[in-house]
Regions:
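Solvent-exposed loop/turn and edge beta-strand elements of beta-rich ligand-binding domains
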Residues: 1-153
Length: 153
């Protein structure tokens, strides 16, 4: 009887134990390379902030290692930054912004004006890691801090 109770208890535990799901990351569609975009929306207290300009720099290329996509620094900055441990880091964005003169400006993105709706659009982008820097602030506002964003992620 004791063995039977232990067996029933073990079966109940296995049935109640939640299954573990493993999800693979979505593989970027190579056909979209060169056809991606970044839209930056400037809003303060729920209202669009127009004016000012943004510049976009490509700081990383997408590469694959052990089946995982990652960002590797562009050639212009490989001597200063060998890898991107945390591509979402504010500190990394600040460091890259301080190296702005070395960074390749994205074609047609050296000075994109922020429109009346508070948006700036960077289009026809290749896969990679990008640094967004505000060159001029909207009248009455300060510049936003530089930030990093990945395409297509």
């Amino acid at each position: 009887m004791k063995k039977y109770l232990i067996s029933v208890l073990m079966v109940c535990c296995l049935l109640l134990y939640p299954s573990v799901s493993v999800l693979a990351h979505e593989i970027p569609d190579p056909a979209k390379n060169g056809h991606c975009s970044i839209t930056v929306q400037m809003v303060y207290e729920g209202k669009a902030v127009s004016g000012g300009s943004l510049t976009l720099y490509k700081v990383g290329e997408v590469s694959e290692k052990d089946g995982n996509d990652r960002f590797t620094p562009v050639d212009e900055i490989k001597d200063e930054i060998s890898s991107f441990e945390d591509p979402g880091s504010a500190e990394l964005a600040e460091k890259l912004a301080s190296m702005e003169k070395k960074l390749p400006v994205v074609k047609n993105a050296s000075s994109v004006e922020i429109g009346a709706d508070g948006t700036a659009l960077f289009s026809d982008l290749e896969f990679g890691l990008y640094l967004v820097v505000q060159k001029t602030a909207a009248p009455g506002y300060e510049k936003i801090l530089p930030f990093l964003t990945g395409v297509p992620y």
